[in-house]
Amino acid sequence: MNARVFILLLLLAARSAAAEHFPVTVESCGVPVTFNQAPQRAVINDINMAEMAFALHLQDRIVGLTGITGWYKLTPDFKAAMGAIPELAPKYPALETLLAAQPDFFFAGWNYGMKIGGDVTPEKLAPFGIKTLVLSESCVQAGGRPQKADMNLLYDDELKLGKIFGKQQEATALVEGWQRRLAALPARPAGQPPLKVFVYDSGEEKPFTSGKYAMPTAIIEAAGGRNVMDGLPASWTTASWE
């Protein structure tokens, strides 16, 4: 058999196998969202969600990023992973900006590219054929059930991405790898209190920091520490220096 024909058959078989997984339904802040096929033109907001997508090697499905350079300085590794993917907006994208990219999928969160009552929300994107996955950590911003942040929020969202893009096995392997790495961390010596950590994001007169519902609290706890602001019943919020 001609080598090119053989490779083509392998590609077609892989595509057919992936198609068998659809339709799939995932929950986005408690709302079921059904995908009849994997997104082909995704837009991803914020560096953390972009890295979640890059971890599944979804670059060939991404037509743009938003909310990157307006908030962050890029590392060489992130620049390499981003490659030629354009940044459509340095901070929050306007509806017109998103529509110009003709996406079929938007991965963002409340206060991570979307604002309650704004022009870019799942409800306002739906009429244009754009399905939205909302970052689970941010659901509390939209009145979702308050839930103290834990690593399962990250794991669940990564598994949802895998399901949406037909990469369930890759997502499962990725999450299991993360879990093994955490489990391998040495335990804190008996009787030793956890290291107290303050998360500083920005602000001078008042610090902008993470509270009980934000992922830094979960990450710090997973590493054996304690966020000193874990009593704040909020996700990201302004606190006082006192």
Each model region followed by its residue ranges:
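A short, structured surface patch at a secondary-structure boundary
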Residues: I44-A101, F105-M114, V228
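N-terminal signal peptide c-region/cleavage motif recognized by signal peptidases
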Residues: A13-S16
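Extracytoplasmic/secreted envelope proteins and their assembly/folding machinery
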Residues: N36-Q40, D46-E51, L95, G118-L125, ...
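Short helix-initiation/N-cap motifs at beta->coil->alpha
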Residues: S28-G30, I85-E96, I116, S138, ...
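Bacterial N-terminal signal peptides that target proteins for export
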Residues: M1-F6
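Extracytoplasmic substrate-binding proteins
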Residues: F22-T25, P32, T121-E204
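Alpha-helical, coiled-coil/dimerization segments enriched in small aliphatic residues
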Residues: T209-T237
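A local structural motif
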Residues: V33-P39, D77-E87, A171, A223-P233
